């Protein structure tokens, strides 16, 4: 298989990451969206009121509101991953101006800042959560948390899922780390095919099983941590019930009518509006 360059976003301290290009994937994985309806994917992370912290992966509620207002006023229709799957299964077509709005990592601000704005502007979004983060913050008393850094609890994820405006995506249970041994859910050096298949499948299935128990809905979407993956990753993740794959590559998307649905996403950093994207 031919190799292509893929976008990798490395996140430091949970919110700061650097987009880099890593040639580790076959052309087939990113060529799967070459025909059909076109759409745009937007990638957000944290939303904070403290303007001094705004940057590459943190925006303010005001910036998010400006984006949603622009999208709404200009006829964009937000579509969820499960809706993409349904449209494909039924042979339907996407709205002329389709956008998929995504939030990675599962910050608690998704409930308190993002959801109210989604409701106000009639938009929908997918929030991709990390299971181990949610476990940790579900054990902490409210007094021990602060909205500026806290992650969603399982109860809060249930509220978001029940809102009708948010779909919950899988961002791995415990592979959201970038260290010398493994970068996200990519294969470790000298890891056998069987070892890699087992560890990746069990991680993804663990979070999907938990989300199904909590929300009553099994996630169809998966976001690669840091955009990092290896040849064979998508097939393994797909065997855990995932059919929509989110990357960090900044390029338009097209609906794949036959294989996997891939959502390439433009990172929305502070100062770079949805209109500019």
Describe the residue ranges of each PLM region:
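Membrane-embedded segments
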Residues: 87, 96-98, 102, 106-114
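N-terminal Sec-pathway targeting helices
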Residues: 1-17
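Metal-dependent polysaccharide deacetylase catalytic core of the NodB/CE4 family, i.e.
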Residues: 42, 46-49, 54, 97-99, ...
């Amino acid at each position: 298989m031919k190799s292509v360059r893929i976008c990798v976003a490395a996140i430091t301290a949970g919110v700061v990451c650097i987009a880099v290009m890593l040639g580790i994937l076959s052309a087939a994985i990113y060529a799967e969206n070459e025909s059909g309806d076109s759409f745009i994917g937007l990638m957000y992370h944290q939303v904070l009121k403290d303007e001094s912290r705004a940057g590459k992966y943190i925006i303010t509620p005001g910036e998010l509101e400006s984006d949603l207002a622009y999208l709404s006023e200009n006829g964009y229709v937000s579509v969820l991953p499960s809706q993409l799957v349904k449209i494909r299964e039924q042979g339907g077509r996407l709205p002329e101006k389709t956008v998929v709005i995504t939030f990675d990592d599962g910050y608690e601000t998704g409930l308190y800042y993002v959801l109210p704005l989604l409701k106000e502007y009639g938009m929908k979004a997918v929030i991709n959560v990390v299971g181990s983060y949610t476990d940790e913050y579900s054990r902490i008393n409210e007094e021990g948390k602060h909205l500026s850094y806290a992650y969603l609890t399982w109860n809060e994820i249930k509220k978001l899922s029940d809102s009708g405006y948010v779909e919950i995506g899988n961002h791995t249970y415990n592979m959201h780390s970038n260290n010398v041994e493994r970068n996200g859910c990519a294969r470790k050096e000298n890891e056998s095919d069987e070892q890699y298949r087992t560890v990746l499948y069990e991680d993804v299935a663990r979070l999907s099983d938990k989300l199904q128990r909590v929300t009553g809905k099994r996630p169809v979407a998966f976001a690669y941590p840091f955009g990092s993956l290896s040849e064979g990753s998508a097939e393994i993740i797909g065997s855990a019930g995932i059919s929509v794959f989110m990357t960090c590559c900044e390029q338009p998307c097209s609906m794949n009518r036959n294989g996997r649905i891939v959502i390439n996403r433009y990172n929305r950093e502070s100062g770079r509006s949805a209109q500019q994207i």
